[in-house]
Amino acid sequence: MQRNARPLELARWEYLFDGGSRERVIQYLASYQNEDGGFGNGLEPDFWLPDSSAIATWSACQQLIEVNATKDEKIVRNLVNYLLLSYNREAELWLTVTPEHNLYPHAPHWQYTKDVQSKWMYNPSVELAAYLIHWSNEESEANKLGWQVIEKALTYLQQAEDMGFHEINNYQKAANLLQDKMGDSKKVLAKIHQLAERAMNKLPDTWGKSYGATPLDLIHNKEDLLYHQYRNLVEENIVYLHKTITTEGVWNPSWDWGDDQLNFAVAKQQWIGIIAINNQQKLQIFQ
């Protein structure tokens, strides 16, 4: 990690696995926060927009939850304020990609085009709404906005026939954070379970050959209903993770930036640290 990770990921690794300080994680994470409270500046390595964005702020939220950040901490208060100000009232969610993304180096999947929001839908808005609720007082403006987005996101969920695994992850995180507060929680979890099962790549020979969801991308602990259903595949996925470690002891991303290999070389190095943390967490949970 010391050779391959940014200071932020190194601080996260030390916090998660080596008894490191949560304050160091927050310190490095704060360096990506803008004056408006949102996050940018390449926090998500696949786009280098310096301005605040929903996706970079979503990434920051996940890392703040990881260190058990509370609503009273300055970094969280400013983030909540950003979410209130950046909510798009016409679309009734936070825009995933904006025209400004195209002005800076970025992976092809972050290219802004007209009507691109129909591709992303509630990725990451449903999860951002859950964080807004988690870090706000009941009856506050932030809390009410969070529930307003959750209500619309749940309507969309129940109507969906299939869904990309990243958006499924958003719903999984939101459901985990809100627990039984999330409407008819059994109905919600059943639908998420159904969509996750459909999105999962169940063919081990094809893992890593295209960008898609392996079992461990959708099954997050041994209490998950899908774990009991696909335990053998989870075990194969663990073996796969061990097999795909490079000689340097890390994992490479399974995607690239197409023709922009020069800038991808920088992003790839940054992703290596993030992927190492994600995979080590998976191995700790299931081994």
Residue ranges and their predicted role:
Residues 1-287:
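Preference for long, amphipathic alpha-helical scaffolds in soluble/luminal domains
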